[in-house]
Amino acid sequence: MKNIKDICLVVAARLGSHRVPQKMIAPFANTTLLDIAMKKLIGSKVVPKENIILAAHEPQLIDIGEKYGISVYRRSGESSRSEGKELTVLYDWHDKLDFKYVVLLNPCLPFLSIEIIDEFFLAYANSKDNGLFGVIAKKNYFWNSEGDLITKWVDGLEIMN
């Protein structure tokens, strides 16, 4: 069992994505992905607001965190541009926070509910393990090089999922 006071929830955000540049502040459903994540988190019934940290470098992202009263860890420019080759650069905050444990939330998941986030946070707090990973069951279909379906088709389905 871990003390909730020892666990922070970090949202790492940046504007330099190569696949979708500026996706954290791009218009999405009359708001932004980062705004959605911040609004959700401040509504948590489990995670204390003082345990929520936005790790960001760019002023536009920092402004969003501050708008919601979220603590901001100011990432280095190098960290915000990193593509994950060196994890110590990408996660430059990992040894600079005053918490024993970190739950990392990807803000690119606008449909992830606060109830699921709270449930995961509690599951981690109540586990004796140092790490925990969120996974979902998903049915995937695979074909061989000749184009033949090699995954067993689910009986009764006319279309995929």
Language-model region placement:
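N-terminal nucleotide-binding beta1-loop-alpha1 segment
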Residues: 1-21
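Glycine-rich phosphate-binding loop signature in dinucleotide/nucleotide-binding domains
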Residues: 3-4, 94-100, 125-127
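Hydrophobic targeting segments
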Residues: 6-11, 34, 41, 51-54
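Histidine-centered beta-alpha loop that forms part of the nucleotide-sugar donor binding/catalytic region
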Residues: 14, 77, 106, 136-137
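Short, well-formed alpha-helical segments that are part of the catalytic scaffolds
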Residues: 20-43
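Short phosphate-binding loop-to-helix
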Residues: 43-46, 53, 59-103, 111-115, ...
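Conserved core of the sugar-phosphate nucleotidyltransferase
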Residues: 83, 89, 110-161
